[in-house]
Amino acid sequence: MIKKYDYLLVGAGLFSATFAYRATQAGKKCLVIDKRPHLGGNVYCENIEGINVHKYGAHIFHTSNKQVWEFVNSIVEFNRYTNSPVANYKGKLYNLPFNMNTFYQMWGVTTPEEALAKIEEQKAEAVAALRGREPRNLEEQALVLVGKDIFETLIKEYTEKQWGRKCVELPAFIIKRLPVRLVFDNNYFNDKYQGIPVGGYNKLIDGLLDGVECKTNVDFFQSEYRDGWREMADTLVYTGALDEYFGYQLGKLDWRTVSFKTHVEDKPNYQGNAVVNYTSHDVPYTRVIEHKHFEMFGQEVYDCPKTVISEEFSTEFKEGMEPYYPVNDERNNQLAEQYRRLAEKEENVIFGGRLGQYKYFDMAPIIEQVLQMNIG
């Protein structure tokens, strides 16, 4: 029986959009459905006051993979935005990631030698306090890696806001390493390439899905597709939540989520940077995003008379919220593994993306994954 589609893709995020693009290039017919009223998943931008607002949080594309970079640039041109966040701790500003600028701001040190001596001295105090045992929690682990001042100013309260738990209650493995740069360099990423699509991420998604049949406001689980997809398509590409696909039969996986308060400010420049992290408990949000700085530089910032900011709050996931980050503790890792084993047994179903694989991915690795797949 000839079916109408080669692929039915559930979810219109980066995994599905890249997959549909490659399948269409190979002459296959695709249908993409998404329960949201828009395409693009979490990279979707909303235009407010002429500014592309990252509706689901800051998305900064970065990779060292030349093939991935050339692929996305073949769809849309990327600008040269460089991520250089600033941390605000009780009104004092520090450059991120931890580098010579940060150490000068914290201690007044001006040479790598002085900075290293200060860090090593504080690390030694933390190691001595453990009396020969391994760190038992995130707090002990971070103190051993960077020492007291950096931990208490830039890590402790920020991490507690992000996770909704105290650092002494979080497992040590969350922080494997904390890179310390003994150079004056505020570029957050070590990757060779980074930037934002010129005109916003919708341009990237629209380019990937050009000529592909797409339907929004369609919930896979509340539609004819849930039980009838095999009559319509040869293969299902599923990028929704892994546990939801199986009706939560083994139990629910936990997620962290974020929420945003977005508002227009009647001034051209609110904070002078795209990303400012608030690393103390006295401010309820974890960071403030000023969206225009992703795409407007120099005089362009002032040519646009208003600006849009989003305060980002990290919260416990509840029914009806958008799942963002997998909770990679022992219980959830084991449960996810059980679901993955079920997924492997599903015939003609590909599970993809952050939700479908219960793994945190940056954007570039998702695209890299799809580029490596045999789609035909």
PLM region spans:
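Active-site/ligand-binding neighborhood in enzyme catalytic cores
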Residues: 87, 92-94, 101-235
